[in-house]
Amino acid sequence: MTEPQVLPDGARVVVAGLGVTGRAVVAALSGRAASVVTVDGRADDADVRDGDDPAVAQRVVAGADLVVASPGWAPSTPLLTAARAAGVPVWSEIELAWRLRVARAGARGPAPWLAVTGTNGKTTTVEMLASILTAAGLRAAAVGNVGTPVVEAAQDPSLDVLAVELSSFQLHHTLTTSFEAAAVLNVAADHLDWHGSLDAYVADKGRIYARAQVACVYNVADPRTEQLVRDADVTEGALAVGFTLGAPGPGQLGVVEDVLVDRAFHAEPGARDRQRTAAELGTLADLAHLAPGAVAGTGGTPVVPPHVVANALAAAALARAHGVPASAVRDGLRAFRPGAHRIARVRELDGVAWVDDSKATNAHAAAASLAAYAPGTVVWVAGGLAKGASFDALVADRADRLRAAVVIGVDQEPIRGALARHAPEIPVVAVDPGDTGSVMRRAVAAARDLARPGDTVLLAPAGASMDQFASYAQRGEAFATAVAEL
């Protein structure tokens, strides 16, 4: 495969955005680009702060050879619109990182990338994958949308392999990557305000499979993900590998009774027993610690939420594509601990559990979170920026889990309307969004009054946080602080 040119000689580069990603891009371009112009209306040290003015945007790109766009910059922004009109290439940070990769210490080439995208579960899956790779004795890091900019990690020669979380924003301007293996976990309507349509959103997710070398991992329960694999132009010999919560067929990973099994990578191609055998990767008991409040089911089998099992299978598939042994998959899953604000139990008080799942920033994620609890036992704290989404399917499918709901955020009407239509019998408290500083304390107080012993108060907002909080993390911290003050 011909490697793409790193940067044009004497390149004049415009960097759109000076957040964490943009600053990492600027650092990476130091000494490589002839000039760098930064554009960000919210950064005091940006070279250009009025890039949203179309006339200014045209002047900025007029002399540029390249624009590197941070994930938050939608294609419709004046700067990127002007770049396209002027014929100036636009790259994502991921595209730049791919072109700047350095060789591993003691190896011939750069570290391979194992990449994950999806509407939900990306961060958990990538962190699970990094845990598995580490258990196999590899120097691995979870990078990308999960935290550390990829452009930094790609230049670290000490890493053996990168576990890369990619959002649809990051994939939109990614053009030449060729991941060792890639996974799309699921696809549900999200970020339609950014992409313009569901079809455009799905297409950007599918970019992750382009030129995949070893495996394209898809969700058997989500036909869109399999179709993206079918449509992808991959490296010859790359496998299509499905994961399923049921018994796997050949070429799949799945669950038999309480055992996680691999029927995709367990034998050499052409092996005589390939169709009839499977490798054991662990059991559901190895995942029980990832479900706060999980109870034992029939025969003592731990009840692990389906989305947790699905994430583990996807991570296992990517690790197996890299050649990791089955024992390391088991050890990595046992050792894995999720990050903050992901189904994290913050307190139990008077028989009521308080759980922070602030990372559930859309309806699909909130549905998965609610599914983990018994019927009629959840006081649901929900709301935020709706991003143009509908909540009817979420409420209709999970109404049986709810005892009550507390609605926060500026986009309350979509959730309140869905609750009125599909769960009219449950009490709903709407928290006035006017006083942002006290919104979570008031929400927690309302939830306390609604909950009964044995219930769970679950913060699973189904919306983005930026209406009243700086991030989902700050929203979760505000929840935990308010609960601690009860």
Which residue stretches match the model-derived regions?
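Beta-strand->loop->alpha-helix junctions that form or flank phosphate-binding loops
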Residues: 40, 91-96, 141-144, 233-255, ...
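Residue-level signal for inorganic ion chemistry
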Residues: 29, 67, 116, 145, ...
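Extended acidic/charged loop-beta regions that coordinate divalent cations
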Residues: 40, 54-60, 107, 159-193, ...
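Short internal beta-strands
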Residues: 37-40, 217-220, 379-382, 401-411
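Phosphate-binding loop of NTP-binding sites
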Residues: 30, 58-62, 71-239, 480-486
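N-terminal leader/targeting and accessory segments in enzymes
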Residues: 1-100
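C-terminal helical cap/extension that packs against the catalytic core
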Residues: 46, 392-455
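Nucleotide phosphate-binding/pyrophosphate-handling subdomain across enzymes
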Residues: 3-13, 24-28, 292-403
